[in-house]
Amino acid sequence: MGAGSSTEQRSPEQPAGSDTPSELVLSGHGPAAEASGAAGDPADADPATKLPQKNGQLSTVNGVAEQGDVHVQEENQEGQEEEVVDEDVGQRESEDVREKDRVEEMAANSTAVEDITKDGQEETSEIIEQIPASESNVEEMVQPAESQANDVGFKKVFKFVGFKFTVKKDKNEKSDTVQLLTVKKDEGEGAEASVGAGDHQEPSVETAVGESASKESELKQSTEKQEGTLKQEQSSTEIPLQAESDQAAEEEAKDEGEEKQEKEPTKSPESPSSPVSSETTSSFKKFFTHGWAGWRKKTSFKKSKEDDLETAEKRKEQEAEKVDEEEKEKTEPASEEQEPAEDTDQARLSADYEKVELPLEDQVGDLEASSEEKCAPLATEVFDEKMEAHQEVVAEVHVSTVEKTEEEQGGGGEAEGGVVVEGTGESLPPEKLAEPQEVPQEAEPAEELMKSREMCVSGGDHTQLTDLSPEEKTLPKHPEGIVSEVEMLSSQERIKVQGSPLKKLFSSSGLKKLSGKKQKGKRGGGGDEEPGEYQHIHTESPESADEQKGESSASSPEEPEETTCLEKGPLEAPQDGEAEEGTTSDGEKKREGITPWASFKKMVTPKKRVRRPSESDKEEELEKVKSATLSSTDSTVSEMQDEVKTVGEEQKPEEPKRRVDTSVSWEALICVGSSKKRARKASSSDDEGGPRTLGGDSHRAEEASKDKEAGTDAVPASTQEQDQAQGSSSPEPAGSPSEGEGVSTWESFKRLVTPRKKSKSKLEEKAEDSSVEQLSTEIEPSREESWVSIKKFIPGRRKKRADGKQEQATVEDSGPVEINEDDPDVPAVVPLSEYDAVEREKMEAQGNAELPQLLGAVYVSEELSKTLVHTVSVAVIDGTRAVTSVEERSPSWISASVTEPLEHTAGEAMPPVEEVTEKDIIAEETPVLTQTLPEGKDAHDDMVTSEVDFTSEAVTATETSEALRTEEVTEASGAEETTDMVSAVSQLTDSPDTTEEATPVQEVEGGVLDTEEEERQTQAILQAVADKVKEESQVPATQTVQRTGSKALEKVEEVEEDSEVLASEKEKDVMPKGPVQEAGAEHLAQGSETGQATPESLEVPEVTADVDHVATCQVIKLQQLMEQAVAPESSETLTDSETNGSTPLADSDTADGTQQDETIDSQDSKATAAVRQSQVTEEEAATAQKEEPSTLPNNVPAQEEHGEEPGRDVLEPTQQELAAAAVPVLAKTEVGQEGEVDWLDGEKVKEEQEVFVHSGPNSQKAADVTYDSEVMGVAGCQEKESTEVQSLSLEEGEMETDVEKEKRETKPEQVSEEGEQETAAPEHEGTYGKPVLTLDMPSSERGKALGSLGGSPSLPDQDKAGCIEVQVQSLDTTVTQTAEAVEKVIETVVISETGESPECVGAHLLPAEKSSATGGHWTLQHAEDTVPLGPESQAESIPIIVTPAPESTLHPDLQGEISASQRERSEEEDKPDAGPDADGKESTAIEKVLKAEPEILELESKSNKIVLNVIQTAVDQFARTETAPETHAYDSQTQVPAMQADSQGAQQMLDKNESCQDETPSAAAQRGLASPDRSGGMGSASEMLAALAVESAGVKVSIEKLPPQPKDQKEHAADGPQLQSLAQAEASASGNLTKESPDTNGPKLTEEGDAPKVEVQEEEMSTKSVKENKAQAEEDLQEPKGDLAES
């Protein structure tokens, strides 16, 4: 026990300087321990032998602890204390070791008192000397390093070792102490035997310790196992450490002990004695925190005031006895040790007391410390409190293990099996002689109780262990006010006494005392505070008393704790401190006033009855009572408990009257209940301290009135419920009154429900309540917190009542609003049960109905919102009470209080259960939405992710509700509720308009987090929504998809876009209807196929390679994001053209974003509509954009200025790269280019799709390649042509030249690849034509999503989701699909980004195609590559890098071929396309497509071969990619493990970045890393690509610089297309994020690896954003590269 105490005290020292105390103790005990070891070698040898055995036993006992302990034990037994010490050191064992040393020293002193006297003198002097150091260390405990320096000493080490020995003994004794609970007699016997042999006689002590060690080992097995594995490990570790201490009594053990002790302070929390102390402390605190309420109440009923007095007296007597015994023990061990022991006992008692009491003070700290060995917080607390005593404590801790044991016996009596177990060791024998003797008598039953509790607590915490002792402590201590250190010193004695008093207390004296105190507190406290009001409360009914009692217990365990605190004393005083305000008088009153109690009963009963006649009077009185209860909460607790018992009987005759009044009382109760709830809510913030007590009383008063009104049955209901709530805290106090009455609980609830029907005046009462409650809210603030706990308990009561109430209230729901008033009480309950079931049913029905409802839902939701607003108004009319009650409920039931009023108001306003259920469901959904949306779209997305499972429209509705919310959030909370309801309705009835407003897709973001799940949801949603959207409107689906795609930013953007998007959607709707029928028919075929095939491919690819798909899709998303980084232009251009041309928004962004979203939600139908819209709209949008550019003057000049929009796009990137000044031009260029590009894209897409439809992917790719090369060439030409772009065109010319070269190199092969892939893809391309567009949309939508990504990087995840789903779609067809999608995306992107990086687009196509050809992995890598392609494609030589990476990843040969093909393509197509693009993009694109078709057909035949090779390679690479790309990414990226698969994309992005950075070396290295097999071809390809990468590094920088300008462009575009501005601003942010967003996508892909990449890319982005020299950008890229390497 001394060890436990000293352990805790040491742990205080050790916590401050966990290492230092060890060293100090080692230094202090080195000679002393050695002396004790030498003098008490028999004892030490035995303990060493026993301790190792015990270690084995304890480790076995600790079972779990055996893991770490076995090593320690074995090593310790082996004498390997160094390792073991290192392992075990750092935990509290240092003090435990000190305690062990003391115990051993004490044992050795008792065994060889003479030797120990000599050695003990040395030890004492050394210990004392070291204790000052330990004190300084204790002071330095905060500074363990200093403490370590001070602790350095074999003596200290040996002390710790000795303490370890002691701890072993103590631990054994602790186990005995734990046994003290049940086996404490045995311990007492063994300890007594030890004491009889000599307080510290080592032989007898060792024998007792040996016996107790076995017992303790066994007991600890049960107790410590219960205590927990950590404690087991701690005790086991401590035991091995102890064994080591025994074995390593040598200086090595000391040195190692120092290390150990250094570790031990950390580990000491694990030390068995300190675990016990921790248990004592933590369980003490936890028990106080958790168990005091219930246990106190139980004990309060058990214990009477007399018992408390008796217990206190007994404790005092036992304290005196223990003091005497301690003195004897002190005298026996050594006079030297006696003085330090006295100090140590005092200090340790202070420490123990502090341990015990501090747990109250620092329950949290102790709980926290319990992990570390709560002694540490205690040490800290004790250190704070004991800073004065620490020196003494330290010296005493070292000097007097016996007294520490004694004190711990006292403390152990307190902690009883906590501290007692700790202190039982050696000091336990003397004290056990007295204490166990006393304890066995009194504590046998109490021990069993304690043991069971301790057993429970040991599993939970040490709170109960300490808790029981604190009760004993508190019982004497509280009267003595032992909160101070001085009192703690006195409490040390008390603690000693309390060892047995705990048992006595558990023998029921303390329990009786506790109950007596509670009763007294109830009586006295109630009498002083407001007998009249309590009389009212009590007069109302025993129910109120029961309820008050139960409610007080339910309302706040604090109140029982308050009562118990009086009983338990200062231990609870910290907790009681809050309640003590009311409790102080209560304690006095409780002590004073049984008579006041009777008077209170009498007074309360009549007065309560008097006021009862009038509901308003009741309410007034209730509020008065509330105010009275505010002051008399504690008295109310005890009073209501006793009152429930006495007054319950007295009032039972009165119950008929009350029941007669029940209608009134129910009304008042309802009003009171609502007012309670409101007042509690209102007062929750106001009432926390004393007000809490008052609050408890007011709660009791209110609930008393409730229950009184409700009748005795209501009382049992509330009482039972409270009892159930209390049941955990104290079933006895609440349970006993409620046991007899509880039967009628539901009846009372039903009655409560029935009077509600009767009480139509409730509205008046509620109105009165509203005003009264407003007043009471002021009064009830204190009641609030009590209510908070009460609410926590009461919700169940409400549920129970609601169950009965639901039966009638459900019927009543159709009743007037009065019922709704009751509903505030009921609805929170009724909806909960009906809520979920009805919600599910309604969700299912709505899920079915949602499809048709989607369009009308918005209008319906508007009507519903009006109705709901009306309902809310009705609820308000009902009184603020409905809202108030909702607010009151919301904490207990639904976090969204506003939603609840809507629920209730809806239920009230719409009595029909169906309506109520629907509204509840809606409200329920809304709460989620309301809560989630406010919480964050991510959380909302998470919520919606599950909701998406419910219905895709649920997401849309959520989005809609989100938009509605955004609109209505400004409205009153009722309006918010209405909005939530409307949102729920919107969810239920999806509305495309709102959906567009709610476009934010972050729900999918949350879903995207679970990509597979998202894909599943998306597949379901895609199929359902695609069908729905196809059937209903492709636009809503597109909107929904877009919302899903970029909900957060798009929500803002689409708010801006909404008009445009609406216009664009209208245009889409109109345009798709027109041209879409043409090209749209093809897209319909493709889109439908894609929409259909997408789910199929989604399903298959998901299963096939969800990760790869996710990674690939994410990489594709990254690629597209990077492309958007490149094409904040394309996406911005798309966005601009989209924003500028709302139709282009549907076109390019819808084509792109819609396709992605289509992939996400309704990518199928949406992509079809989007593709139709894109193509038709792109043509029309190109026109419209050309027209819209006139609308957007900035864009008009760009478009009009640059008839060759691809060049502008190139210029646009260049502009973005070069200057914000170019940004306006960029916006212009984007719009114009986007319009034309979209036009070209539209026609080209049409043509491509026509070619695709006719020629297949090859013609598409021919068109794509041609168009890309056209765009590239034209872009280059136009770059050079446009003055704005000229400077940019210089870079872009270089970039273009490089990229074109790359594409010419790569593109011809990749054209063939693409052709082949498209050839392979035609199968999927018709199916995935849209996924390709989906990839397109991700580009533009990634502009949004990236813009959104700037706002919320998770949007790219949604984009990823789109891409993932696209990839899911294309994963099976990943090679083809990805190639196709990438090609199409690149086509669209190239079209839109044409100016940006046609080559880059080509590069994107090439890497994407390569990747897709290579496989899903290469999609990952090409996506990785493509991700860099975003910025790096923007760099346009990055495609080289990208190409090298994928090529290197794929095959150097393939890469070289692809590079050659791409270059050829880019050369062929760029050259042919350059002029036509400059001349007429559409005609040129068409002509080029036609021209390209032959070439593409040739390429197709070649591609077919290449694709077969590439697909085979992709398949091979797919496997390789898992290995090789992992190796590649792994090798290339230092970010190996997590990055391997996921970071393959991000790493390859980084690799590409690095390739740009490292250029040739990185590319070559990457290639070599990618695949050694490919390294050959990769060498050349990577060299070319590396050279291009060098250029692309600069280009990439400029291109990445472009996103910052897109920000400017976005700002300028914000003038016209604010959505684009947002998309671009965020796209530029995401441009910077582009690498981030690739990483955002990537990190989600490669959560670990990508994160560094994100940083790198962020740095790269920012570096590129610097818009400095390519060299600078490259250097910056290299810096992020270094960062990547670092990361």
From Swiss-Prot:
Intracellular or extracellular location(s): Cytoplasm, Cytoskeleton; Membrane
Lipid bilayer topology: Lipid-anchor
One of the protein's GO biological processes: cellular response to interleukin-1
Positions where lipid (N-myristoyl glycine) attaches: G2
Location of region: Disordered: 1-108, 175-282, 298-355, 402-481, 496-828, 959-981, 1035-1105, 1125-1221, 1277-1361, 1443-1487, 1522-1582, 1599-1687
Molecular function terms, GO-annotated: adenylate cyclase binding; calmodulin binding; protein kinase A binding
Protein's UniProt keywords contain rRNA processing: no
Keyword terms of this UniProt record: Calmodulin-binding, Cytoplasm, Cytoskeleton, Isopeptide bond, Lipoprotein, Membrane, Myristate, Phosphoprotein, Repeat, Ubl conjugation
Oligomeric and partner information: Binds to dimeric RII-alpha regulatory subunit of PKC.
Protein name as it appears in the record: A-kinase anchor protein 12
Gene giving rise to this polypeptide: Akap12
